[in-house]
């Protein structure tokens, strides 16, 4: 709609950055409370979480750039402008998890308890990011559709380029001169719903917690499934495996995220089984 929350002279404070910052701080506090309730020392977590956030953001942006390379090859500096939106949450999870793993191997910090405790914060980040995408307008653009749920952007809405029908290359979206007036799938809202579902599920997994690592791998599993089913088919993303496309309904299969999600689902199932067996053998 309007990416700028507040304009103070030349300084523009954007919704995307404000919402993500709030999600990070709230997620951090939720993680601290969870670890304290489990009896873990908070000092090591507080030392590593800053770097986990930094490399989570780096991984998120890198993942987005690598899966939508056309535009960024021609405009490489745009890859640095994360306030314009465009973050891969698979990349964020990978970047953050690798940071925790590094400190686990290097300094002996706990791995699975930290990753488990961080899951509500990641879910909040998904919700915040998608609302920020909605305000940006140009992020996570939905496909044109004739379905009743199609949304037509109002004339006063700002912050988005046009979308041409039938495009599968995201770089073409940026080039299109037409204004986006829909009706389109409002995939920003679809993605926010995915984040809300994961937030409630992550809180349930943390309470259940049959073993450390359970909440984290359940999160990876269900994020991959829910994103692939509820959001990706309706987004105007390049089809890496063009198995199905319906321009009338606004559905396309399969995007890069959907392709990557399958091995992540299998890995999650394997790790849940492995960690569960390890816990059972210690009893």
Swiss-Prot record:
Q: What are the GO MF terms of this UniProt record?
A: phosphatidylglycerol-prolipoprotein diacylglyceryl transferase activity
Keywords (alphabetical) are:
Cell inner membrane, Cell membrane, Membrane, Transferase, Transmembrane, Transmembrane helix
- Where is the chain membrane-spanning? 8-28, 48-68, 80-100, 108-128, 186-206, 210-230, 249-269
Pathway(s) the chain acts in? Protein modification; lipoprotein biosynthesis (diacylglyceryl transfer)
Q: Does the keyword Transmembrane apply?
A: yes
Tell me which Pfam families the record gives: LGT
Q: Which domain of life is it from?
A: Bacteria
Q: Which residues bind a 1,2-diacyl-sn-glycero-3-phospho-(1'-sn-glycerol)?
A: 130
- PANTHER family in the record: PHOSPHATIDYLGLYCEROL--PROLIPOPROTEIN DIACYLGLYCERYL TRANSFERASE (PTHR30589:SF0), PROLIPOPROTEIN DIACYLGLYCERYL TRANSFERASE (PTHR30589)
Recorded family membership: Belongs to the Lgt family.
> What's the protein called, per UniProt?
Phosphatidylglycerol--prolipoprotein diacylglyceryl transferase
What organism is the protein native to?
Thermus thermophilus (strain ATCC BAA-163 / DSM 7039 / HB27)
Originating gene: lgt
């Amino acid at each position: 709609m309007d990416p700028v929350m507040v304009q103070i002279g030349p300084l523009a404070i954007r919704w995307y950055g404000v919402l993500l910052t709030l999600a990070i701080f709230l997620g951090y506090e939720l993680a601290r409370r969870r670890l304290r309730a489990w009896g873990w020392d908070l000092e090591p977590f507080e030392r590593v979480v800053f770097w986990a956030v930094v490399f989570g953001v780096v991984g998120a942006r890198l993942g987005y750039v690598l899966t939508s390379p056309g535009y960024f090859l021609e405009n490489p500096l745009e890859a640095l402008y994360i306030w314009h939106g465009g973050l891969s949450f698979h990349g964020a999870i990978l970047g953050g998890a690798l940071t925790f793993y590094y400190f686990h191997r290097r300094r002996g910090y706990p791995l699975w308890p930290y990753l488990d405790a961080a899951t509500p914060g990641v879910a909040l980040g998904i919700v915040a990011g998608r609302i920020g995408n909605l305000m940006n307008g140009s992020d996570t653009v939905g496909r044109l559709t004739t379905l009743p749920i199609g949304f037509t952007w109002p004339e006063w809405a700002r912050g988005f380029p046009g979308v041409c029908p039938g495009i599968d290359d995201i770089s073409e979206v940026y080039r299109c001169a037409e204004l986006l007036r829909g009706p389109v799938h409002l995939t920003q809202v679809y993605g926010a719903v995915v984040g809300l579902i994961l937030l409630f599920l992550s809180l349930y997994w943390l309470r259940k917690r049959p073993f450390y690592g359970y909440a984290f791998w359940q999160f990876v599993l269900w994020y991959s499934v829910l994103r692939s089913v509820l959001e990706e088919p309706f987004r105007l993303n390049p089809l890496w495996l063009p198995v199905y496309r319906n321009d009338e309904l606004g559905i396309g299969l399969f995007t890069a995220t959907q392709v990557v999600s399958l091995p992540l689902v299998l890995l999650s199932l394997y790790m849940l089984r492995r960690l569960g067996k390890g816990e059972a053998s210690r009893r």
